[in-house]
Amino acid sequence: MYYLKNTNFWMFGLFFFFYFFIMGAYFPFFPIWLHDINHISKSDTGIIFAAISLFSLLFQPLFGLLSDKLGLRKYLLWIITGMLVMFAPFFIFIFGPLLQYNILVGSIVGGIYLGFCFNAGAPAVEAFIEKVSRRSNFEYGRARMFGCVGWALCASIVGIMFTINNQFVFWLGSGCAFILAVLLFFAKTDAPSSATVANAVGANHSAFSLKLAL
């Protein structure tokens, strides 16, 4: 039970919990939001999901490369967290109105945001925390379990909230994102001194090239 005294175990376990809590507010209810709230047809729904998949495919290799380059630095997670803070304003004031204005424009904008934050963002978050688990000596699977609990709990809560007012769901997601920011701020991922020296002299970095990116 040594991991219970590990601060990073709790920090990133809770990060998983709230990140997947937000995902649980998005994935199961997104088709319902499109059809019942925005009255999007099935064919247009297909366009939206195709755009999300397209941008996910574009972002995932980039995130993989950035994750390797950044190591234990939290820059990418800060960007993802910052975008998740805008979860409610994006859905309520940007994505929904854009879908009513022009389905293609709305699909592109939604594909970029959702592909970045979730479809490509989730693997980047998991890869980062896996690195932290090795650095901080806690089992990744135990921290990842927090995410499963967060998703399951959210599905129960959001299902009730959605029937009352669908906007509550998005504001709940933004509130959870603020908690992510607090957790990320206090989490310590400093590399050990030997690794820091190796990074400083470039021993742990390969030269960037187009071949590497592809």
Language-model region placement:
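Juxtamembrane intracellular "pre-TM" segments in multi-pass secondary transporters
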Residues: 1-7, 187-214
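Helix-to-loop junctions at the C-terminal end of transmembrane segments
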Residues: 58-72, 161-163
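C-terminal ends and interior cores of transmembrane alpha-helices
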Residues: 81-101
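Residue-level signature of mid-helix packing/kink "hotspots" within the transmembrane helices
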Residues: 53-61, 151-152, 156
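Hydrophobic core of transmembrane alpha-helices in multi-pass small-molecule transporters
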Residues: 17, 87, 99-124, 128
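Symmetry-related core transmembrane helices of the 12-TM Major Facilitator Superfamily/SLC fold
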Residues: 169-186
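Helix-loop boundary and gating motifs at the non-cytosolic
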Residues: 2-53, 57, 210-214
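Cytoplasmic membrane-interface "Motif A"-like loop-to-helix N-cap segments
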Residues: 68-82
